[in-house]
Curated annotation (Swiss-Prot):
Domain HTH cro/C1-type: residue ranges: 24-78
Keyword tags: DNA-binding, Plasmid, Transcription, Transcription regulation
DNA-binding region: 35-54
Protein name: Uncharacterized HTH-type transcriptional regulator y4wC
PROSITE patterns assigned: HTH_CROC1
Pfam families: HTH_3
GO MF assignments: DNA binding
InterPro entries: Cro/C1-type_HTH (IPR001387), Lambda_DNA-bd_dom_sf (IPR010982)
């Protein structure tokens, strides 16, 4: 039986699927968990986890529940910022904050996550400011 165009559209991953996949990847990396380990915890291969994270395959509600349990978060975690993201996409380009791709790439890198984890543990605002100044200084010497 041939499927209609609307059926194909419903099954095709969309921006929300990509966002959920991105949040799965972020949380998994935050937990220092491999794709293989997450896959084993939810009963799929690491390739399937990869497809979820890239937004290639949709994550069903039951599977999302399993993922949230394995990653120790509520299912709503994967939808956080979805509304804000959609709203920001609707704004004109002049109103959007443009984050350079290399910054985004660093933030989701292993080193970026380690740095963010360590920095988030520093409670004293003055110490945080000094760390920022130090990193800026070190970066200036690299140029």
């Amino acid at each position: 039986m041939l499927s209609t165009n609307s059926e194909q559209t419903r099954r095709k991953p969309n921006a929300v699927d990509a966002h959920v996949g991105q949040r799965i990847r972020q949380r998994r990396e935050w937990q220092n968990m491999s794709q293989t380990t997450l896959g084993e915890a939810i009963g799929v291969t690491f390739q399937q986890v990869q497809k979820y994270e890239k937004g290639v395959n949709r994550v069903g509600a039951g599977r999302l529940q399993q993922i949230s349990k394995a990653l120790k978060v509520e299912p709503s975690y994967f939808f956080e910022d979805t509304l804000n993201k959609i709203r920001s996409e609707e704004r004109s380009a002049s109103n959007q904050i443009n984050i350079p791709p290399e910054v985004v790439e660093f933030v989701v890198s292993k080193e970026g996550i380690e740095l963010i984890r360590a920095f988030s543990r520093v409670g004293d605002y003055r110490v945080r400011r000094r760390i920022v100044m130090l990193v800026k200084s070190l970066g200036a010497h690299e140029r």
